[in-house]
């Protein structure tokens, strides 16, 4: 049993009984290599680049990948750039949405510090959620660029997120990284049974973190069959996951089971098959009778993707 959570690649790869798919996930350094070798370097600009005739002030709202990239380009073109971020650290998805195992945060901060050294300013703890906020930006800056990303999570009907036993993946990953960066590493999934709904990249991130925190069991559910998923051709995935008990394809959650005190204790699942009930109709995930199973679960993480920007952005 882990004494504390593991949040770096080297130690993660030393974990016992690490599924091959998560070993491949951890060994993939493509994102880290890009941030280190390509991102935000002060390269020579093309001759026809539209350089600013004067250092006009530009506001960039959001400091995720799009916001940082925008700030970098505008800075290189001679503009006076200020980046507004609602979190306590810049970086957005790169800071809080990607585990430290995949993207070391000290590397990311080196790049952000480089931008600051070039004159890009960062305002943290600032949120765009009212018309007067946007009005002030328009008054103080010659231009405003919105780089807020897609942060409105998808939900499952009847499932209420409480951030105690049931989490959205984004919130879970954010708190994990904040705990690590604030020096309060604690294995809050240690010894627990964890079920993750969603078989995409974010779900894989959550599965890896659950194992890194010493979870007792981890089960990731995906309605699609493996060969129908976006990642099926990558690294010969479908052959690799054969026999991997931590990922269940063609499976969906049927209902939650709680104890007498109302606490989550299990998830009932059912296998599905994709077929059309009538000619010409699109295939749908139809339950396979008699395939129901119970998975112990004290923690449920919803990694269902996003619907778009939050409503407050459009209201502002």
Residues covered by each model-derived region:
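Active-site glycine-centered loops adjacent to acidic/histidine catalytic or metal-binding residues
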Residues: 198
């Amino acid at each position: 049993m882990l004494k504390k959570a593991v949040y770096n690649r080297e130690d993660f790869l030393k974990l016992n009984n690490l599924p091959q798919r998560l070993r491949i996930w951890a060994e993939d350094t493509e994102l880290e290599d890009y941030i280190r070798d390509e991102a935000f370097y002060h390269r020579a600009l093309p001759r026809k680049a539209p350089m600013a005739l004067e250092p006009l002030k530009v506001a960039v709202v959001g400091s995720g990948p799009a916001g940082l990239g925008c700030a970098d380009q505008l800075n290189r073109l001679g503009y006076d750039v200020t980046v507004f971020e609602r979190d306590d650290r810049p970086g957005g998805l790169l800071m809080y949405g990607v585990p430290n195992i995949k993207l070391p945060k000290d590397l990311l901060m080196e790049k952000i510090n480089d931008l600051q050294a070039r004159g890009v300013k960062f305002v943290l703890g600032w949120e765009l959620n009212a018309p007067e906020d946007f009005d002030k930006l328009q008054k103080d800056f010659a231009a405003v660029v919105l780089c807020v990303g897609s942060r409105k999570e998808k939900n499952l009907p009847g499932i209420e997120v409480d951030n105690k036993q049931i989490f959205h993946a984004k919130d879970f990953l954010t708190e994990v990284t904040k705990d690590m960066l604030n020096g309060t590493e604690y294995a809050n999934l240690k010894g627990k049974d964890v079920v993750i709904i969603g078989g995409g990249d974010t779900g894989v991130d959550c599965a890896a973190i659950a194992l890194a925190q010493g979870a007792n069991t981890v089960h990731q559910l995906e309605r699609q069959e493996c060969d129908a998923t976006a990642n099926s051709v990558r690294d010969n995935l479908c052959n690799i996951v054969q026999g991997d008990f931590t990922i269940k394809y063609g499976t969906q959650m049927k209902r939650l089971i709680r104890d007498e005190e109302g606490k989550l204790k299990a998830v009932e699942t059912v296998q599905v098959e994709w077929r059309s009930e009538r000619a010409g109709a699109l295939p749908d995930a139809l339950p396979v009778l008699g395939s129901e199973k119970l998975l112990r679960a004290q923690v449920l993480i919803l990694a269902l993707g996003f619907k778009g920007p939050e409503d407050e952005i459009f209201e502002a």
